């Protein structure tokens, strides 16, 4: 059995060596073994000191209290409890403890200083508290007095919002019956007062779980949702923000440290489930405004699916699928033109599609996905009714909405009996609403070639008739987009054109005509861009489009409007125009094999060849495409999806292809715009944007391309391109870019090292590809100026220096030899230790050095002579080795040459080396 006294001594030793965790373990073990009260008090006091050091103030105060219970005059325990209580904000209790300490030891300066400090702090706190109390009362008096001046009420309302955001102010409002008074403001029916009350409640709920829980129960979820349901965008948004803050506080997502009182809060899962249920009920309630429905969808989108798929708990999504998927589908199926439609905004159905997509992506296994599909199938088939056309429209509109979300699921639903047939049948209807719904559904359904072929066979003539005959612009533009999408169903395959030669050109002209017509509403012009997004897969169309500068500028202007849902269509059009989509590599042998087996072989359009693409890129740059792209990158994250970011990254990379164009891109802010694309989005998008940054950073002045602190943000994307899974060209251009950056300053070199680029750069110095090996060595040459890199070369047990010396001997690759010799010159000039190490790591060092000094390339020769000087300057023994070899003769020949401008720096370096030898007394001047 262990001895408690020995355990105490061990604990003391651990405490003195700052190993507080080990000390706590020893004291805790000793406490279990001992019954003597005085000894227990000492152990509690010691453990309290450990907890103080670990910033665990609650436990420190508890242990000190246990020691004081045994001996009320234990001065150490009293002071430790005082320190802990002060940190916990309990100043009055801390003051009492230090007052007792000062009574016991009146001359102790530490106690007296603490007593004075705490006294001052308590006075300040009381002053703030009383002033806050009076301010809160005064504000509520003004707000609740209907006779108060409007200006006074607005000022009081704003002050209340500010107070609600401060912890002390929020607590004072809460303690002074503030929640009930705020509810009176909400009941006043004055929009300004309602907004102020909601925003104040929102501030009070932020970062405080106990207060948030109390407010939920005092106000009620039902009441908050009814406020969010009103037809006022600002109030709906404020109520949404209030609910979001409540959810964040209940789940701990606010990332704030919670105090001791948080332990009293009961399990919050029940409250969160009630909130989710109320939000789902809001989706199908006719009493809820379009803005309220949008905010309910936004809250579900943000809080239900998992952010991190590594977290295996998707129970929230499963609950919503079971309890509310049909309600979400009801929103998807709404037709705004019908009289009994729920109140909607232009974005409501799109938000619902996003939610369906996120829920479907959040499912973890096939049974969960099957359940999701079955619910959708039952809902759609249950909506079909031969006697009720409105129900049929609702079913088709639902399928259309799902096709805009989880497309794979939507495609399975298209296979249901009667769905495609119903779409085609509704297209032939004389009712404009039927046509509108059916045409839009056909557009979304014709993404897969097999579906497009069915529509071309059964419905294209109907679409043409609608396009020619209808006078309704909304239907006409949708019919046009439908024809555009069907016409592009063959993709870039020239042999799979769906329509006759010239048909797609006519469709494109009409799209451009609508796009350039400012009298048309944004929604119609948006559809025109969507049509072009499909048609520009045809090389003839994209060639004509980029020549039409008016259409390009109209599209760019449209992308800057408040309706950001157009961004994906614009980005896709630009991807098509620059040919920056993925193209499978054509292997000639496989083509021959396919022809032999009578399989279809894709054909490239003549205008998709490299020279045509380059001309299109030049025209886009001339039309100010970079400014438009920069504006698109700044769009709100909820609209700028990862897929859109990927498309923008592809376009930027294609625009950066020609080094001559990179100056224009930098001048128009393209370098800055690419940074966020390289840091966020899909893996493919980040790689493409990083590659674009590498192309810019490789040839541009970093101060101009990435001004200020932005240059440091570029390093991580560039380092990511050094991954061995990336292409050789990406590795090469990333190394060039890092070389350029590392030559700028040591802070940048330090950032490159911090991002763990050194091992990757060293790895590429062994690469078989000579250009990559050269780029890596050049990068190392610049990094060699950094202290940490020098230390890595000086460290024992590695061959870094040996590799550099051997690369200096690569006479067949002059650029590589220059880079390696430059690195060696830097290292030997900076550290004398490396001069000695150079002669030890390989026996070939002398031969390689002599070859450097005799090189025909002046840059290599200069580096060789500098290395020789560094060795001579470093140590007399090293100098002796060089003098005893043929090096002396080589340096003498170089030093005796007549002054020549292009070789003067080499001659001077050789002369300096000879002067040093003269100083050592190894050689004498000829009298």
From Swiss-Prot:
Pfam family for this entry, one: UNC45-central
GO-annotated biological processes: cell differentiation; lens development in camera-type eye; muscle organ development
Keywords in alphabetical order: Chaperone, Cytoplasm, Developmental protein, Differentiation, Myogenesis, Repeat, TPR repeat
Location relative to the cell: Cytoplasm, Myofibril, Sarcomere, Z line; Cytoplasm, Myofibril, Sarcomere, A band; Cytoplasm, Perinuclear region; Cytoplasm, Cytosol
Domain of life: Eukaryota
SUPFAM superfamilies noted in UniProt: ARM repeat (SSF48371), TPR-like (SSF48452)
ARM repeat extents: 167-206, 209-248, 746-785
Main location: cytoplasm
Known role: Acts as a co-chaperone for HSP90 and is required for proper folding of the myosin motor domain. Plays a role in sarcomere formation during muscle cell development. Is necessary for normal early lens development.
Full protein name: Protein unc-45 homolog B
Gene source species: Xenopus tropicalis
